[in-house]
Amino acid sequence: MHPALGHPRALSSAPASFPPPPAAARLQPLFLRGGSSRGRRGSGDSSTSTSTSRGGCGGRRGGGGGSPSSSTGAEREDDDESISISKPLVPAAAALPGPPAQGGVPVSATAPAAASSTSTPTSSCSMTAADFGAGAAAGTVGGPGSRSAVGAGGTGTGGAASCCSCCCCCCGRPTRSGRRGRRRGCSPSPGCRWGYQALSVVLLLAQGGLLDLYLIAVTDLYWCSWIATDLVVVVGWAIFFAKNSRGRRGGPANSMHNHHQLHHHSAPPLHLSAAASAGAGAKARGGRGGSGGSGAGPGTTGAAGEFAFAYLAWLIYSIAFTPKVVLILGTSILDLIELRAPFGTTGFRLTMALSVPLLYSLVRAISEAGAPPGSAGPLLLQPQQHRAAGCFLGTCLDLLDSFTLVELMLDGRVPLPAHLRYLLIAVYFLTLASPVLWLYELNTATAAPSWGQTSGPGSCSRLLRLLGGCLVDVPLLALRSLLVVSYQQPLSIFMLKNLFFLGCRGLEALEGCWDRGSWVSPSRARSSYGAPPSAPPPPPPPPPQGGSQRGHLENEGGPHGYVNTLAVASQN
């Protein structure tokens, strides 16, 4: 497309009248005219003579000064001829005329700004179908709120372009500027994604290094094997984090797309009926990668496999941590630690207690890496992450219960026989390894735990929860009862905790057996971890009236088809 001839002209600083549209433009339909609806400023404001008269396409010419009033008639004829020759199929601003935005800036001057993220800046006034599709989806089709939001930052149905222009209205973070001044969408910061993973590795090294220090400095037993064990655990966790992020490499992109569609979706095309418009809006809100079943939300798809390999990582840690502590508690090394170590048994207690923040860092590292932007926090978690938080709190209470039993050995207040001492150590490490069960349960779950099904992930979840209660709470309650009866120990509040957890898990198992063969009602589905069933799909839109059925059938998807449909209808 050749630029118009004539001397370069700068922006005018004095009010000037605009030339009438040429005869070739008057013969075209209204939505194909370029520059028929050009805004004007008031008598006190200054106006532009180049960008506004070209329909807002940004045809600014650099060069020396010169006002539009000093241009000759030949130059204007050349300009008009150039406009009529290079007239695009759908102009940038005159596709759907509307009222000007606040401040006197016309819609034609602001429409290309909304579509600047998809179109490359050129010196011509043409606009492709993709550019119009982005601009129509962002501002024009969205309604009058979108047109006013572009110029004045207002809010409306289609105010997506203005919402993400400088910052995200959902997560509140400023967007990063891309190439040529474009704005990128919402994106999670790398620090939030990798912070808890780095903290997990630091806690692994700290706990393993302190235990190695106790074993090597006090007894000098197999120091190479202890250090090699720590290195194997750290490398295994690093491989777990790498495989977890690689397995969900496409997850953040789908989550970002669904997050953008959820908060910045535009209205469906104008030529669709009401039922089809509702279906298009539901599709925009539901996301592209969601499953069609119940509970398919924007964040559910990305969270389906986020706990993969987590149970293996914790199992490796439990296997490596157990022999070190058993060797210290079961031999005379504990007495040597009290005599030679800097902090004595207090430092050993703190080293054992690092398992709880390590488990917390593991759960948060998985949740932060898979969560969509703006969903961090205890009140905005996905169903699986709510389940993980509840299981973590239960495991913390179980570890605290078993650790108080181990402290009876450390203090020496109660003369326990050898078999009871080993039983206490076995119960402690059984409690330490219990997160493997619920991490595996979260891994085998699909989009969300389905409690109302007779087989599949729901039955597996009930079985694993009941098994975890029997393996942890029953031995702890039996040991507490034995200490109360045989060794005159006082009653502990942890006995009530064990009874409460056993009762809750038993009720869950009975509820699953009672509801066998029946689906969950919608009211119970809303109160449980699952999501309510989705509404039935809307009926297909009726065929359009008139002679443009062929254009609707061929070009029915998206703004591109909408533009081509308008062109076919105008030709008919």
From Swiss-Prot:
Name the keywords, alphabetized. Phosphoprotein
The biased composition feature labelled Low complexity covers 44-54, 88-123
Q: Where is the composition biased (Pro residues)?
A: 533-545
Q: Does the keyword Phosphoprotein apply?
A: yes
Positions of the UniProt region annotated as Disordered? 1-123, 525-572
Give yes or no: UniProt keyword Lyase.
Answer: no
One Pfam family of this chain:
CECR6_TMEM121
Q: Where is the composition biased (Gly residues)?
A: 55-67
Phosphoserine (modified residue): where? 162, 165, 548
Q: Which family does it belong to?
A: Belongs to the TMEM121 family.
Q: What's the protein here called?
A: Transmembrane protein 121B
Instruction: Name the source organism.
Output: Mus musculus (Mouse)
